[in-house]
Amino acid sequence: MTISPQDALTRCIEHREIFHDEMLHLMRLIMRGEMSPVIASALIMGLRVKKETIGEIAAAATVMREFATTVDVPAAILDHFVDIVGTGGDGANTFNISTASMFVAAAAGARIAKHGGRGVSSKSGSADVLEALGVNIMLTPEQVAQSIEAVGIGFMFAPNHHPAMKNVAPIRKELGVRTLFNILGPLTNPAGAPNILMGVFHPDLVGIQVRVMQRLGARHAVVVYGKDGMDEVSLGAATVVGELKDGEVREYEIHPEDYGLQMVSNRGLKVADAEESKAMLLGALENVPGTPREIVTLNAGAALYAANLAGSIGDGITLAREAIASGAARAKVDELVRVTNQFKK
């Protein structure tokens, strides 16, 4: 079933849903560059104002995956293969907590396929801070797979894996607000990681995104929203969790105190640029006491639970503390820098 972009826009204005097959058609037009930027931006904002449904998001993610340049990984690693990602758009401008957590989780035995880009709505995207650390992010899909094998971490720079997104990038940049594409990025991991720790920018998205992951065939998904507005597990407030496990979805709240952590404001986590983010990230991995280390420990613990290496978030936190205290997490940074730079011609 097809629908014209103009009819879809009318549907958005009237707060009516765009059906699965219609959304597939519209997304393919956008990804092929066959929809004018004016109509595409109007439609993207129309969906945002209407509020995207589970069906619309799942259909859009399906098309984005169709157009992606994928990374092949061996089936043997899938049980503990995880993505740690935030939708961005939370406006918090914190250091790269999910990127720091990635090094900790890998040091504790997870295999990570991290999918990210440069800062769009933040001061420092995952690609920005990794480059500041000296990581070569311009890898081929084969090199990403080799990096996962050698280090336990593969970073997939989104523009390399979603070439069709070049048709959307100028629109996203000019709009400068969070849109459907903030929601889609975490759903379209090019390595097909079946497990995920995903932070979202709005509480309504917790239940939506976890059910989208269910439709897309994820194994273990932990979707989180900090009630202080963070797209991470927060130290400054309760965190709303949507979890998909064994095919079932449940929603609940967790608190820092549940894990023996003190509730503290996240104000001290703000950074102005990638260099500041790098300094805070390294401090956390070097076991410097303070809020950065604690929030990384908390999020890495949740990632290790999502990766099926811990029976609970609390058990994951114990593993994360050990990985930081032993120096293994900090060593992962140097390992990733060394391995990725070997690929440079």
From Swiss-Prot:
Q: Cite the Pfam families for this sequence.
A: Glycos_trans_3N, Glycos_transf_3
Q: Which UniProt keywords apply?
A: Amino-acid biosynthesis, Aromatic amino acid biosynthesis, Glycosyltransferase, Magnesium, Metal-binding, Transferase, Tryptophan biosynthesis
- Binding-site residues, 5-phospho-alpha-D-ribose 1-diphosphate: 86, 89-90, 94, 96-99, 114-122, 126
The UniProt record lists the keyword Thylakoid = no
Query: Could you tell me one molecular function GO term of this UniProt entry?
Result: magnesium ion binding
The highest taxon in the source lineage is Bacteria
Binding-site residues, anthranilate 2: R172
Under Enzyme Commission nomenclature, its number is 2.4.2.18
Write down the chemical reaction(s) this protein catalyses.
N-(5-phospho-beta-D-ribosyl)anthranilate + diphosphate = 5-phospho-alpha-D-ribose 1-diphosphate + anthranilate
| Residue numbers binding Mg(2+) 2 | D231, E232
Q: Name one GO cellular component term.
A: cytosol
Q: What does this protein do?
A: Catalyzes the transfer of the phosphoribosyl group of 5-phosphorylribose-1-pyrophosphate (PRPP) to anthranilate to yield N-(5'-phosphoribosyl)-anthranilate (PRA).
Which PANTHER family does this one have?
ANTHRANILATE PHOSPHORIBOSYLTRANSFERASE
* Oligomeric and partner information: Homodimer.
Protein name from the UniProt record: Anthranilate phosphoribosyltransferase 1
According to its UniProt entry, this protein's organism is: Ralstonia nicotianae (strain ATCC BAA-1114 / GMI1000) (Ralstonia solanacearum)
